[in-house]
Amino acid sequence: MKNILALLPILLLLQFNAAGQDVIRLQSCTDSLISRQVDSLKALYEKDGHILLKEASITMESEYEMPVVVPLSQGARYQFVFIGEYTSRLYEVRMFDWNEKQVVFQQKKWGDVDGNIISFAYIAPQSEFHMMKPLQINKKKKKNLCGYVMLFKKVN
């Protein structure tokens, strides 16, 4: 009985500590402009011999990266696409390999022709997980920004 009473305060402390930590939760979003761009890009890449491996709409906060982890196979050709909300001023995507070495960095600004879309090709030098970190900066809207990520693989 004494052991149970001694263990109770420790369990309570662990519960409060775990509940107090901030956690990034993936939440989907809907934006009609982004949906049209997604449909157009899917058709374009599928026509070019790509298959869609993963896609997700994500609710983002201005100036905060949203990590996306994907397994990539050695020698395969991939196309990564990030679409940000058109009212944002800056868009970035950084990609890191398993050793946390940055292997891709792209940035677009609002005034660019295709400013809210970042797309890049990548051939994985070895089979391992990679992390993409899309980010967008919006001066007026700080929370609930809509973003969309897609990963395609070239099949022919």
Task: Report each predicted region and the residues it spans.
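Short, surface-exposed beta-strand/strand-loop-strand elements in extracellular ectodomains
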Residues: 87-103
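Non-cytosolic beta-sheet module surface loops
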Residues: 70-72, 82-86, 124
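Beta-sandwich interaction modules
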Residues: 70, 114-126
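Bacterial Sec-dependent N-terminal signal peptides
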Residues: 1-25
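Non-catalytic, beta-strand-enriched accessory regions in extracellular/secretory proteins
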Residues: 49-73, 77-79
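Extended, low-complexity, turn-rich repeat/linker tracts enriched in Gly/Pro/Ser/Thr and Asp/Glu
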Residues: 84-92, 139-142
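C-terminal edge strands of extracellular/lumenal beta-sandwich accessory domains
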Residues: 21-45, 95, 126-156
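Solvent-exposed serine/threonine-rich low-complexity stretches and specific carbohydrate-binding patches
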Residues: 104-112
